[in-house]
Amino acid sequence: MTAMTNIYETTIIGGGPAGLYAAFQAGLYGLNGQLLEGDQQFGGKVATYAERVIHDIGGMPNITGQDLIQNLTAQAAFYDTPLRTQTLVTDVKYLADQDYYQIDTPDDRYYSQTLILAMGGGVVRPKQLRLFEEQTFENVHYAPANPEDYRDQRVVLIGPGYNLMELAPHLLATAKSVVWLTTKRPFVDEAAEKAFLTAYPQIDYYCQPLASYQQVDQQVTSITLADQTQITFDQAVVSLGYRRSLQTLDQWQLSAEQIEERPDIWVIGNQIPDRAGISLLTSAFQDGITAVTEIVAQLKPTAKTPMVTTHNPVFQADTKAYWQERLR
């Protein structure tokens, strides 16, 4: 791609809830935009608690993180806005003589008139299990998935993470067996631990160090505990917490002062500093709307405001499909 072939009107960097909803709004307002996400999946921080239920989104009493991500991704894709995963932005610089931004990734270079930064706390990476010495195994997963994915499998959960406390009971309905291994008690006290294990006696629970593991090809087949108990399994889910890093942003030629002062850069979502402890998804959605409407006012001052979605003919086919499904 070169500057002569395509200059995006806006580029959204970050594919969490804030970035995904901003991408939808960009399409709704007719902007030629794109979204760049460094991870292999969308969702940002929400992807780290995909199976937990969110209760504080207006009009949505309960929804899992996974379903929310799927819905936001489908919504963002409605206008065919390019949504790129595994596209880590390694550098951004302002080209003053041409009045737009050059955006570099490992595989390509893009150009954009405006930027929407929706990077939250940065790229989210799960902490690796030290026992495996940072090796990658086909049957070791660091992001809890749908319990259905483990049907009829012997599953071992590793770590003290609250994600596992949420996942373990659901696995009882699908997995062949569930074993939970941790070196640190995940419960607030002994009473809470006893209550959980009494409620779910089918879960085999061990709180002790992990001594070694056995593997066949690219799969771990068993783990030996400190007391020499051997746990054999088909699938492992590890939850030791996450590391978040904005290191790539620090390496950009675009300075912190430019990000703060330039009128064609918007920061949205959890990347906004000094939010007085407020961390609501709905705030991130409003940030995206504000950024997009201000970009339109700047680039297309005579553009008409799009019709509300309830009456917008663009959504006619989607609305028809919704009612057909609802009335089945």
UniProtKB/Swiss-Prot annotation:
Cofactor field: FAD
Key word Ion transport present: no
Sequence intervals crossing the membrane: none
Coiled coil regions in record: none
Database matches in Gene3D superfamilies: FAD/NAD(P)-binding domain
Pfam families linked to this entry: Pyr_redox_2
Reaction equations catalysed: 2 reduced [2Fe-2S]-[ferredoxin] + NADP(+) + H(+) = 2 oxidized [2Fe-2S]-[ferredoxin] + NADPH
Entry's EC annotation: 1.18.1.2
InterPro entries: FAD/NAD-bd_sf, FAD/NAD-binding_dom, Fd--NADP_Rdtase_type_2, Ferredoxin-NADP_redctase_2
Organism: Latilactobacillus sakei subsp. sakei (strain 23K) (Lactobacillus sakei subsp. sakei)
Assembly mode: Homodimer.
Cofactor: record remark: Binds 1 FAD per subunit.
Protein name: Ferredoxin--NADP reductase 1
Keywords per UniProt: FAD, Flavoprotein, NADP, Oxidoreductase
Enzyme class: oxidoreductase
A GO term, aspect molecular function: ferredoxin-NADP+ reductase activity
Protein family according to the UniProt entry: Belongs to the ferredoxin--NADP reductase type 2 family.
Residues reported in the UniProt entry to bind FAD: 37, 45, 49, 89, 310
Key word Transit peptide present: no
